[in-house]
Amino acid sequence: MKILKNLGSLAFVLLIAGSLQAGGHASSLKWYSDGGVDLITFEDKEVIHLSKEQLGSYFGKGKQPYKGKKIAITVNNSGPKGGISGPLHRLRPAWEELTGAKLEIVEMPLAEQLSKTMFDLRLGSNQYDGFIEGAWYMGEYVTPGYIIPVDKYIADPGFPQWDPDWFPPSLREIHQWNGEFYAVLNDSDGQVLYWRQDILGSKEWQTRYKQDTGKEMPQPPKTWRDVIDIAKYFDGKNWDDNDAEEDDGVVMHFRVNEQGMFHFMSLSAAFTVMGGDTVDRGTNNYWFDPATMEPLINQPGHGRALETLYELSQYGPAAQSAWDLGTAWDWFLRGKSIFVFSWGDVGSLVQDESRSKIKGKLGASVLPGSYEVYDMNNNRWVKLDKPNVAGNTTGGSWQGVISAKSKNPEVVYSLYALMATQPVSMWNVNRGWTGVDPGVKIHFLPPVGSASVLGYIKEGFHESDLMYYLDAYHKNFFADKMLPYLRINGTEEYWRALDQNLSETMIGRMQPKEALDRTYKEWNEITERRGKAKQLKQYQEAVGYKN
């Protein structure tokens, strides 16, 4: 049995509760004389220790403040040990014993979750008390008043304790709406570049690369052109000794409705996002012209980005156009590609030797940049002395929100808050299968955070992998420029159109320009159908545009 303690030393105290509940059922809690408690996870029997202060004053041995109540929470259909849904299953018995309430976990396919929950809310069936949502759903939920702010619960010391000040500004923003918190800390999504450090850092391979290409191998890659050149060089070579087959330069995934379009968003920021102290068409902006709501998706910067993505994809497995996320990850974990750029799950999954062959061989960095960025204000390419690098919060940052129709909002919040406490959050980020990624202060190392190298190593991390991993994510979430996050009404529709057209490009049915021109047309149609004036007002508020 693995015991997780709060980072830092923790004195052992007298165990005062037995391992059985009344009635002889195995308990999921073990209480201590100081008011602390061990949460025992379902099936795995791992132990997460919370102090009395972390637990909150409403909860304690024998209290069960919500006895007899029941809540239903929707989440992605990943199963009892899958991403995002798995932690709910693993912590449900402990939470139920702690609160006295019952939790129904309602799993839904990613492509159906927003439509099903919105249908329920509009119809007034009120089947669900809360949603573990992708951050891009928030506009759909907030603007009609379907979810409630949680600031008053956060400030209440009775609930399990977590601190919004842990957030970097980039992540704080996507948990709030108009300055109020609607979502609770859970997952921190952003994409970084991963590579095989044992290969790219090898003097033998560096020498061979220079002999064969006449150039030094960039280490780490600074631009997307560097990534393409290196991927091209290694593609088709058997550079990894895990098998006798040829290996690839990169791996991605592009199956429709499997989040493949996020590859394009993250990569394209280097060619499109220009920083500054304002927001306008070409500054700190990406999606639409904030003065007119004209889509910018087919601008030259976006076009070059898609051409770059397509070129890079040629140095990966031919089948990746039909792959889902997990299949692409496993290709990298098996040692079959030099590069993958993806979410934080990869860094922790690399440590799982039942799934990974590359523990101790990982490199990672903030996503590469471009020496040219397209200025959408002046309609020209700008050449730079240093690569244009932008951070991102690409992905779902899957977060708990509470239905305004719930009769038990405080019960829902108690579940979310428990998941957000430092011990539970650290338990999550140390296990790649949970889908919960690092991104806040408690996950980073001093002097920028409060976690410890030893704590991660005890949980199975290789120290070299860890240092690359956390440095990449800190630089990503605290980057000077960030890819703006789209959360307005219709985001799901806008992104679905982009996803489908990108897939057509990746399988060779459509040229990049045609794909983005079609997306431009479809985005205009979505905007008109939803009401251009309303969409424009919401977009202006979302990006901070001042007319």
What residue ranges belong to the model's regions?
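Extracytoplasmic "Venus flytrap"/periplasmic binding protein-like
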Residues: 90-169, 174-183, 202-204, 208, ...
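Glycine-centered hinge/linker elements that transmit conformational signals in sensory
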Residues: 226-231, 273-322, 363-372
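Short helix-initiation/N-cap motifs at beta->coil->alpha
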Residues: 107-116, 222-226, 320-334
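Extracytoplasmic/periplasmic solute-binding protein
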Residues: 176-187, 191, 225-290
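C-terminal lobe and pocket-closing loops
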Residues: 31-50, 58, 62-65, 348-357, ...
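Short, polar/charged alpha-helical segment
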Residues: 56-62, 80-100, 194, 198, ...
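Short, well-ordered beta-strand elements
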Residues: 67-80, 101-106, 129-130
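Hinge/lid segment of periplasmic solute-binding proteins
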Residues: 29-65, 135-192, 243, 363-367, ...
